[in-house]
Amino acid sequence: MSTAGKVIKCKAAVLWEVKKPFSIEDVEVAPPKAYEVRIKMVAVGICRTDDHVVSGNLVTPLPAILGHEAAGIVESVGEGVTTVKPGDKVIPLFTPQCGKCRVCKNPESNYCLKNDLGNPRGTLQDGTRRFTCRGKPIHHFLGTSTFSQYTVVDENAVAKIDAASPLEKVCLIGCGFSTGYGSAVNVAKVTPGSTCAVFGLGGVGLSAVMGCKAAGAARIIAVDINKDKFAKAKELGATECINPQDYKKPIQEVLKEMTDGGVDFSFEVIGRLDTMMASLLCCHEACGTSVIVGVPPASQNLSINPMLLLTGRTWKGAVYGGFKSKEGIPKLVADFMAKKFSLDALITHVLPFEKINEGFDLLHSGKSIRTVLTF
């Protein structure tokens, strides 16, 4: 019996307020409007960005259904949708690609102006919501809201992928892998023979390590205070691993001494102001490039001496690894299917969706790299 055009009742993890656990609720998911797509979720990863909302470090309207790193199957489409159809395997895109705005038309940029990250409204692009719980409208998150058995997204925020794709693996390409890997190959444009430093060895940081290796870096120095992550980092391409707590001097000074004045490329993949500054300072003052990948805390600012940049450093930011999402994500999935890279090492835990709070506990304890929830 077709559910197209009907309200679907299903389970979703609702965050009612910050610093509280998710609540598994019965929700109603409205049919997609014109140029929208309703997706049956199959697998979703737990990303640190979702946790930033829980902790209050990333502000978005609540109550909300979070989640943005996922893969699923199209259940139905609204009027006018042409790029996907019911039955297609897809990845929702937390940064859309409308193809019409100034950013989308610029070949060097990917931060589509239809995004809901910079100033989140908690709605779809038409300003309305598709979720209801206990008679109350529930906000969306980043236009994806994948912590739900069904979700609705805009057509420009979903990408059709290879029909043979294992969704419980390629869901990581929806955020973590693409963000980290792309920050190295697209944003920093790591060069063969170069020296790199990666701050933070979670799923995104390890993906940045993989990107540095793929780009031909000669030295990849992984930096984290959790030594348990070092073996995995070396498995994925790190040549050295260091713990800032093992040194009396600032970690940027340690790195500069190790690399004859500083690394060529550095990546902050944590989302802390102190490590953002350390990442900048550890790259060479005349030719180094530092990339901010981690989502920074809300309402906090960095203050720097302009001389740090005047001498020749470059300081950049990266969203979605610089990939134009609707074009780039299917290509990454195709590369995965062609065995150009593996995602297995990043997935440390697989849990049923109902155990979402256990998944976040694993994240907080530092025991997981990526936990994938299956529906």
Swiss-Prot record:
Q: List the GO terms this entry assigns under cellular component, sorted alphabetically.
A: ciliary basal body; cytosol; nucleoplasm; plasma membrane
Question: What Pfam families does its record include?
Answer: ADH_N, ADH_zinc_N
Q: Which residues are listed for NAD(+) binding in this entry? A: G200, L201, G202, G203, V204, G205, D224, K229, V293, G294, V295, R370
Gene Ontology biological process: retinoic acid metabolic process; retinoid metabolic process; retinol metabolic process
List residues modified as N-acetylserine.
S2
Do the record's keywords include Lipid metabolism? yes
Quickly give the catalysed reaction.
Answer: all-trans-retinol + NAD(+) = all-trans-retinal + NADH + H(+); all-trans-4-hydroxyretinol + NAD(+) = all-trans-4-hydroxyretinal + NADH + H(+); all-trans-4-oxoretinol + NAD(+) = all-trans-4-oxoretinal + NADH + H(+)
Q: Does the keyword Disulfide bond apply?
A: no
Q: Where in the cell is it found?
A: Cytoplasm
Q: Which annotated residues bind Zn(2+) 2?
A: C98, C101, C104, C112
Provide the protein name. All-trans-retinol dehydrogenase [NAD(+)] ADH1B
The protein's organism comes out as Pan troglodytes
The protein's gene is named: ADH1B
